[in-house]
Amino acid sequence: MRRAKIVCTIGPATDSPEQLQALVDAGMDVARINRSHGKAEEHEAVIERVRKASATSGRAVAILVDLQGPKIRLETFQDGPQELKIGDTFTITTRDVPGTKELVGTTFKGLPGDCAPGDRLLIDDGNVAVRVVEVTDTDVVTRVEVPGMVSDHKGLNLPGVAVSVPALSEKDKEDLRWGIEQDADFIALSFVRSAQDIKDVHEIMDEMGKRIPVIAKIEKPQAVEALEEIVEAFDGIMVARGDLGVEMPLEAVPLVQKRAIELARIAAKPVIVATQVMDSMIKNPRPTRAEASDCANAILDGADAVMLSGETSVGAFPIETVRTMAAIIESTEENGGERIASIPGFYADRAGVICEAAARIAEHLDARYLVTFSQSGTSARLLSRMRRPIPMLAFTPLESTRRRLALSWGIQTYRVPEVQHTDDMVWQLDQVVQSSHLADIGDQLVIVAGMPPGIAGSSNMLRIHEVGDEAECRQHDAHQGEGDGDR
């Protein structure tokens, strides 16, 4: 069973019902809806199709709505793409002007206030670089240092500059409300700079009466500096290596990735490695050897998930890409899973200690599964963060929890009715593993749950169960005949 999860960005190449079903069947665990592109009604149709494909397959598939963020972009060029040569003067202005080879507008009206002579600006993910030579109230005059083509709406990065854009643009606020209305499982916040950035998101969620887990995208130097605080404040992180590799030296990105994964695991929060994991498969049916190694190394670093962007949104081989990624992950886990480092430190909280004890007992007993019954998914994530070789099952009465656990490493989920007694939990477990042929009579299962059942965050029980144990089944039958007051 593959443990690390696969996040797929949905786009024109994969938004049909047939392609979405094929993605799910190939191994997609999370569907990413990129609100930088496409219309709301198109994305609503995609979400509905993903839910149907998930139901058809019987596998939980989560929806991640990725907010565009305050991305700084060029405006349009009246005569199409322009070629900039070394030494050319190129002015970026806040004025409303037709774009030319010498002058173009920007979406960020605060640009002159944030720039100073000597600053280096990068266009189109660094394919073009310019140096600021003069700043006025409305214009940033630059000289071209790295030549190339510029065209409509290309991104503009200011490495090392603390840009004064808000955490949420007006479009982001609209898209956040839309994502909540669509019952998204995760919201990804772009260009996070500090732990405080989650406050604006939570304010809108509280206005709408619903909290959804928020993933912080690590793509700014300020976020790297505040990484521990961001991991603590948010519900998960994404190492967005595209903008991160533009804003920071390329050679710094691998260690940022490793540190981010370690911190997220310690906090028992999901961590995604994103951008160019299988980039060549946008055009080619096979990845490069370097890409295969990159994917495998993200798994060995301990990532919960790896993400595909253009490979599945606009690529020529989206289904093949997911199958290839799944095969690389499975091979890496099967042949090198022991290389995934254990996380440092001790578990100080009660639930963490219980989960650690359960994992050790399961290994000593050679148990078939580690099992958790969970309302919120917390105990499942606590088991997941240890990256133990024993397969893990999570049972929950909540579909929302089941879908959110689709992003967590190694968790196979089942939705079951809510019960009032732990013996009933064990009976449910026995029925599922036998009917699904997951375990044989006599197999040992190590269970983590809370007493009384149904209270989120109450994991306080560890139990060993033998599949098919008639005595425990009789206990369930006895409880079925009792009144609630006797439990």
Mark where each language-model region is.
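Non-catalytic helical/linker scaffolds that mediate oligomerization, partner binding
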Residues: 1-487
